[in-house]
């Protein structure tokens, strides 16, 4: 029989990335968390956490994390379904269930919050959003640190199901002054090699995809690193560099003349999918169905 106090310690370490932060979340000492994880590893006969900065789950650890969080979600659902049993309802039904999801920053900054707000309020559900690049969010559900993910990966992660949400369209944009300074002679291999671009983080490959489409070559321009979606767009508006920005964030700026499209008609489309556990959990299934429906109102 699994000891859920030990499993909770494992989940906390994987979720928070360190034993110290897990200890604060559980209101115990780091030593206690370490002892619980070590005891669990001894009982299952396998290393469950790769110690590092951050700590991450091993394959076995990810399986146990997913199991533990599924049990927690099922208990939350059970508490809401048994109001006629006061003791059980009191034990399980008072806390709002929490859904931990991985979402790319562009989606959070444009459509995701508007899509899910009403559902969260009506169903008394809390969101714990993990920000990651859209090409890497699927890894979060694979390693057991989230229960769902908005991702570019169409193929379902093992034990999950995948549904298409829609498409985000990105365009290469910059300020008019920046365009005149760097691209007066055209957007080509030489000008793209010299002009600074804006990258969200090292995982952001949209700028590289655009460069390869235009030049059919690998070009390494000077780069600003700005891991904040509003700051990213602002850097383009103020002439710091050019970048790939979603239409939903730049349409008004382009209409006002604060941004210009560098190569009209050469947008990049990014298909987004919702991946979540295949295990049927009522409100998690309802969340996925709602997200698919609402995403259609915001995405192409």
Model feature map: region roles:
Residues 29, 36-39:
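Residues within the DNA-recognition helix of helix-turn-helix
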Residues 93-158:
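Central regulatory/effector-binding core of bacterial HTH transcription factors
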Residues 161-240, 254-267, 297-300:
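C-terminal regulatory
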Residues 11-27:
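Short helix-boundary/capping micro-motifs
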Residues 264-300:
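A late-sequence structural motif
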Residues 41-60:
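A short LG(V/I)-centered, amphipathic sequence patch enriched
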Residues 43-44, 64-92, 291:
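Alpha-helical linker/hinge and terminal dimerization helices associated
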Residues 16, 25, 41-47, 122:
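Residue cluster at the C-terminal edge of the helix-turn-helix DNA-binding motif
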């Amino acid at each position: 029989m699994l000891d859920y106090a030990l499993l909770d310690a494992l989940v906390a370490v994987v979720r928070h990335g360190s034993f110290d932060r897990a200890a604060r979340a559980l209101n115990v000492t780091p030593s206690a968390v370490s002892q619980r994880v070590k005891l669990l590893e001894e009982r299952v006969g396998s290393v469950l956490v790769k110690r590092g900065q951050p700590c991450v789950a091993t394959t076995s650890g990810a399986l146990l994390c997913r199991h533990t969080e599924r049990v927690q979600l099922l208990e939350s659902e059970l508490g809401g379904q048994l109001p006629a049993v006061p003791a059980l309802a009191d034990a399980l039904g008072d806390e709002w269930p929490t859904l931990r999801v991985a979402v790319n920053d562009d989606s959070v900054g444009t459509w995701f919050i508007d899509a899910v707000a009403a559902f969260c309020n009506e169903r008394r559900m809390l969101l714990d959003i993990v920000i990651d690049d859209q090409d890497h969010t699927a890894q979060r559900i694979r390693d057991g640190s989230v229960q769902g993910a908005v991702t570019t990966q169409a193929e379902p992660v093992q034990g999950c199901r995948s549904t298409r949400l829609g498409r985000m369209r990105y365009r290469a944009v910059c300020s008019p002054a920046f365009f005149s300074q760097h691209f007066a002679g055209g957007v080509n291999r030489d000008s793209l090699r010299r002009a600074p671009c804006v990258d969200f983080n090292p995982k952001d490959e949209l700028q590289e995809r655009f460069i390869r489409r235009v030049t059919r070559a690998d070009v390494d321009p000077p780069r600003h690193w700005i891991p904040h979606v509003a700051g990213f767009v602002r850097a383009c508006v103020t002439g710091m560099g050019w970048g790939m920005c979603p239409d939903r964030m730049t349409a008004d700026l382009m209409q006002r003349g604060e941004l210009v499209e560098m190569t009209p008609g050469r947008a990049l489309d990014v298909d987004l999918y919702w991946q979540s556990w295949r295990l049927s959990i009522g409100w998690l299934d309802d969340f996925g169905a709602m997200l698919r429906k609402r995403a259609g109102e915001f995405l192409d």
